C-alpha cells in the first residue's frame, strides 16, 4: 500500500514538477533561480486587487478604531446621510467595479480635460441648488479677472477716508466714496429693541426678502453683490467715481446708478424694519446647517430646543431712541404718592414742628400695622413685591456686578455733588433738595447658573441626536 501511495505521489506530483523545472535548471541557468525558489511575477490585475483590499482593510481598521460600525445601508439612508461635498473614498479606486451613486441633489463632478464639456443645467425655478449658485458666482468672478488681466491698467487713486461712525449715512449727499468690501457685502444686524408697532406675522412674512425658500443668508448676500456687479441694473462705472474722488470718469452718478442704489437701499431698509422675525429666520438655512447636511427633523428638534431654552428679553440701549429718552418714555414712572384726605402737602417746618410731625407719623404707622394684622396679611402683601425683585445673593458673581449707572443731564451731576458737599459741611439745610430727572440704565437680569447648566446639559443631550449616523459603505 505504502509503495502504491509513493508511486502515485511520484507519478502525479513529483514527475510533472521535475518535467516543468528541469529544462529551466538545465538550459536557462540564472543565479536567482539556482536555489529553486519560485518567483511569481504578479500581473497587474492581481496587484490592483491586492492594493484595493489593502486600502479597504486600512479604512476598516481606522473606522473600527474611531468607533464607527460598518454595515450595509439602504438607498434612502445613503441619500440622506452622504456628505455632498466629498465623493466616498473607495468610489474611484477600482475602475471595473462601478459604484452607482444614488443621491438626489447631485454635486457637479469635477470637469475632466479628456471629455467634451457639457453645458451646466440651468437652476430650476422652484429649487435652486445653493452649491451651483456659489459655483456660478466664483466662475463669473474668475471670468471677470481673466478679462481684466490683459487690459491696460489705468492709474487709480486711493479712496478718500471713510467717514466716522455717526456720519455713516452722510456720504450719500456730498462726498461719494467707494464702498469698502465690508459695507458692500454685509447684512444689517437689527436688535429687537425698537419702539415700533409689530405687524401680524403674515405681513411680516410677506415683507421678508426670502419668503419660503430655504436659501441661506450667505446666498442672498452673494446674489445681491452678483446683481450689483453683473445684473441688468448694474453700475457701469464703479461707485467711487464721482466729483470728489478721482476716477475713470469724473462727474456725478447717472440716473440708472441712482435708481439702482435707491433700490438696494430700499431693500435693506425693508429688511431692517422687518427685522428677521422668528417666522422667517426659521425657514432660512443657517451656515451650520449648510456645512453639515442635516435632515429636517433634526433641524426641527434643534430649533425646538433653542426656542425652549433661550431667554428672550427686550433690552433698551441708551442713546437708541433719543426722542423717547427726552420725554422719559423709556422709563416706567414711579407710582404717584397718594395723600390722605385730611392731609395737605407739607410746608417748611421749624424744629418743634418737625418733632411733632415725626410723632404723628409714628402713630399713623402703628395704626396701619394694626389694620394689617387685623386683616391677617401681616404686611406681606406690601413687601412681597420687593422681596421678589431683590436678587441679592442669587448669583456667584455678585461681588463683580456694578451698581446701575445713573446718567444726569449736562452739568446736573456737578450741581448734585456741590449740594451734597454743602449738606455735609452743615450748609443751609432749609434749601429744598434738587429734583433731578435721573435716567437709570440697568442690564437685564442674567440667567441663574443652574438654569445655564440645565441648558448646557440639554443641549449636549439633544445634539447627540444630531451627530451623523454610523458611516456606510
From Swiss-Prot:
Keyword Signal among UniProt keywords: yes
Composition skew (Pro residues), residue ranges: 155-165
Compartment(s): Host mitochondrion
Entry GO terms, CC: host cell mitochondrion
Keyword Signal belongs to the record: yes
S-S bonds: none
Signal peptide: 1-35
Taxonomic superkingdom: Viruses
Function: Plays an essential role during infection by modulating mitochondrial ultrastructure and thereby increasing bioenergetic potential. Mechanistically, alters cristae architecture by interacting with components of the host mitochondrial contact site and cristae organizing system (MICOS) complex.
Subunit composition and interactions: Interacts with host MICOS complex subunits IMMT and CHCHD3.
Protein name: Uncharacterized protein UL13
Lineage: Viruses, Duplodnaviria, Heunggongvirae, Peploviricota, Herviviricetes
Gene name of the encoded protein: UL13
